[in-house]
């Protein structure tokens, strides 16, 4: 069984800011997307690192979960997704850690999924999914041409219980411990995917996504890029660090 960090999902009432930031500024290229009950989603990939998924409500009773999220928090990071090869074995690992998954749905042979509530997952929803095949949908017309290529090379997540969070991401979600001490731990997955866990007390639900980092493989981000990215990221409830040579 393998578990791989696949994407960071962001809930938003409008997709334009996300397309401009992650596509136009940060060079994300369309992968796929489509309709799910109550919401539409689309994913962009980068030169390395996890994908970004944008989610927006599509109306109807099934949209209530995302509408509530946006009403409470506004546009902001919604979940981490991990793709697994054996979801039942992953669920057994999760339960062995004393965590009970929620919204477990194994009925669809093409997409089996379960979630960890933020109270159990150190401040953010975690989705684990077993996927068979990928939907092929044309890129949205409003998606800009990708900007210069960038690497999505870090997610920093602050947690109150560093030891417990490290166990979850390492023992259940197959993160390889790259470094760690009493204050922080870095875990990696294939494809240049890196989560840094940093201890911080007093966080709601025991954790909070602090920032993400993108690095240009060739050349530095311009002052205009940084200003534009900062404005767009703020609208998405996200802090983006731009790095370069």
Regions found by a protein language model. Give the residues of each.
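Core segments of cupin and vicinal oxygen chelate
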Residues: 1-3, 9-51, 89-112, 116, ...
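Vicinal oxygen chelate
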Residues: 4-13, 42-47, 52, 65-151, 178, 182-199, ...
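Anionic group-transfer/hydrolysis microenvironments
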Residues: 9, 55, 81, 119, ...
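A short alpha-helix capping/helix-coil boundary motif
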Residues: 20, 68-71, 145-146
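Conserved donor-binding loop and adjoining core beta-sheet/short helix segment
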Residues: 32, 50-67, 199-204, 243-245
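Generic hydrophobic/packing signal
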Residues: 58, 81-84, 95-98
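Short, flexible helix-coil linker/hinge segments at the edges of structured domains or between repeats
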Residues: 58-69, 132-142
């Amino acid at each position: 069984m393998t578990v791989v960090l696949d994407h960071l999902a962001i809930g938003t009432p409008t997709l334009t800011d996300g397309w401009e930031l992650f596509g136009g500024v940060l060079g994300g290229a369309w992968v796929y997307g489509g309709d799910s009950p109550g919401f539409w989603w689309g994913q962009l990939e980068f030169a390395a690192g996890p994908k970004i998924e944008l989610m927006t409500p599509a109306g109807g009773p099934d949209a209530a979960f995302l509408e509530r999220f946006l009403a409470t928090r506004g546009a902001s990071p919604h979940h981490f997704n991990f793709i697994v090869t054996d979801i039942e074995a992953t669920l057994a690992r999760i339960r062995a850690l004393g965590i009970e998954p929620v919204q477990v749905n194994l009925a669809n042979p093409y997409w089996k999924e379960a979630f960890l509530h933020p109270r159990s997952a150190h401040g953010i929803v975690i989705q684990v999914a077993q996927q068979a095949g990928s939907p092929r949908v044309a890129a949205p017309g409003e998606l800009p041409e990708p900007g210069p290529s960038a690497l999505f090379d870090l997610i920093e997540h602050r947690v109150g219980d560093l030891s417990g969070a490290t166990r979850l991401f390492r023992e259940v979600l197959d993160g390889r411990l790259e470094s760690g001490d009493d204050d922080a731990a870095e875990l990696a997955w294939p494809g240049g995917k890196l989560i840094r866990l940093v201890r911080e007390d007093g966080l709601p639900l025991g954790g909070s996504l602090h920032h993400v980092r993108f690095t240009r493989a060739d050349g530095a981000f311009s002052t205009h890029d940084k200003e534009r990215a900062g404005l767009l990221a703020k609208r998405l409830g996200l802090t983006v660090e731009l790095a370069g040579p």
